[in-house]
Amino acid sequence: MDKKKARLRRAASTRHKLQNSTRLVVHRTIRHIYAQIIAPHNSKVLIAASTVEKMIANQLKNTGNKEAAVAVGKKIAERALAQGIYNVSFDRSGYQYHGRVQALAEAAREVGLNF
């Protein structure tokens, strides 16, 4: 099993366990990081933030590092709190809780999102 298939298998397992809760889903690429808050039953995206957005990207020198992940974490938490979402389950999509994924999660917690 290669690295990508193993990550996707872990991600599917996590999604199955969290299917009845509001999820904060993280996806990362070499250049960008994406975060979405997804509704529990119908899998609709309620809130999204990423380094692709001009408002976030213009404040950053590089969109693929920890500073960018912190900016996305703060923005997604601010948007969630504005819509009345305070508690979510963290879905790291099979990625290790390390580096950019960890930075995004800690920034969201600092703003006030609970998970």
From Swiss-Prot:
GO biological process, one term: translation
InterPro entries per UniProt: Ribosomal_uL18_bac-type (IPR004389), Ribosomal_uL18_bac/euk (IPR005484)
Record flagged with keyword Ion transport: no
GO cellular component annotations of the record: cytosolic large ribosomal subunit
Entry keyword set: Ribonucleoprotein, Ribosomal protein, RNA-binding, rRNA-binding
Cross-referenced SUPFAM superfamilies: Translational machinery components (SSF53137)
GO MF annotation: an example: structural constituent of ribosome
Family affiliation: Belongs to the universal ribosomal protein uL18 family.
Function, in words: This is one of the proteins that bind and probably mediate the attachment of the 5S RNA into the large ribosomal subunit, where it forms part of the central protuberance.
Subunit text: Part of the 50S ribosomal subunit; part of the 5S rRNA/L5/L18/L25 subcomplex. Contacts the 5S and 23S rRNAs.
Protein name stated in the entry: Large ribosomal subunit protein uL18
Source organism phylogeny: Bacteria, Pseudomonadati, Pseudomonadota, Gammaproteobacteria, Candidatus Palibaumannia
Gene: rplR
